[in-house]
Amino acid sequence: MDSKTVPTLGETLKQLGMLQSALAQQLTETLELPLEQAFGRILKQPAITESHPFLNSFSDNLNEYLEQTGKKNNALCDSIIQCPAMQQADHSGILLDDEIFLNNLFFSMALSSKNIPYGLTIQCSTVKCISARAPLKGPLFLKDGNQPVRLSDLSNSQLKSRSFCNLPTPFQISISAPADQQDSRWKRLREMWNTKTFTCAEDAFIAINTELGKQIKYATGTEIVFLDERFTSFLAAKQLLNAQLPLADMIFDATLRSLILNIKETTIDSDDNFVLGHDLTDFFYFKSEQKLELLAIENCTTGAELILKRRSDGTVLARVGKRELVRMLEDGRLFCDRFLGYFVRCFGTGLKALGGTSQQDSVGLYQSILRKSNTQLQFMNTPFENLCFRDELTFLAGAPFFEGIDSSLLDSINQSSTDNLGSFIELIKTRKVKQLIGNFQSCHYLLKNAVKNKERQ
């Protein structure tokens, strides 16, 4: 694709189709639907009776986590059972970021169309604090028009090597003032949050999003509950102890672990991959003082312990049995990588993952890795196998569906105006998806990735 040419939606879908992209098939089947009808397609669940015990187990684990963290919400757990889906499009960020706001507005609208009162969003808190430098991007940076807004007084040098979950604790929000001091929204936020100290950055963002999300709930009737990768770690810990699930074998059985990781590496290096990154870690990240370390896992020569080594230099970081591994996950010393995160949240729970452009083909590659591994060395029972390899485990949702909307119309849904938001929802819900999605520019980087991957081969 010529880097100077912006392809039409039809051209984009054709090129994605040539890559056998799941994203192309999804959109082709959805484009002619009005948005309010597309919600039903997006949230549609496969008829797999085996999902019920796994889904109930997820709901129980979610209930326990919410209770432990002081956020008990039985209605959310009931909503998950009614409509097994979660939104996973977000990096850690607050709802004043346009993309994050639109992701969660879309999710809330979709759930509301099915009369579901609560939805669950998992934000990726293992994201780097600085993801781009010109202009600065990351979870602690916003833009208000052309004015930069910082959410922390930490310097760029302090943030450079950190992941969001590695920010200093306790954590204090410090919202810088845009040049326009008359902006009541920023003034109100500074008054509300700048004096407060939180246990950690993740808790700060959850508190802010819970408050800002009231506007979405007011407009749709469905409330979004925000969690982060600490919940994914908690879920992995619970699944390690569940004999009905294969996770413990995947981690502790040296032969099986090596098989899965080798197939994963081969898949990432293959022609089929234009979505997965090349930073390889053995299932987990180890949380050091300033950053997340990539791991290499080995079995001890005696006993059932694992040796966790820093991948870059072989330094031994820990020796762990199953119980100690569980404690490290629960204590926040270990985080799941992207592959394992999807495995514990969606592959073995019955939940559909709603997310962004790259997720749609990433999940297919992850399924391929697991299917090839299970074919060569059977480690799944039949109910889990049926659940893991079900169709439509993921679906595109969120901000991409708003790309074709006039920017002035998007500007009208200012966070301070619930009336504007309600009017916006009424305006768009009867429009066809193809009218809303525009040229679908958010996926053009995937086409460029495919070209680069082909050149590298």
Feature locations, PLM:
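Aromatic-residue-lined binding/catalytic grooves and analogous aromatic/hydrophobic interfacial grooves
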Residues: 2-5, 9, 182-317, 324-331, ...
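N-terminal catalytic cores of NTP/NDP-binding nucleotidyl/phosphoryl-transfer enzymes
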Residues: 72-121
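A short acidic (Asp/Glu
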Residues: 95-107, 128-137, 207, 212, ...
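Catalytic or ion-translocation cores adjacent to nucleophile or general acid/base/metal-coordination motifs
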Residues: 113-169, 331, 343-344, 359-428
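Substrate-recognition/cap regions that form aromatic- and gly/pro-loop-enriched pockets
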Residues: 303-304, 312-363, 370-371, 380-389
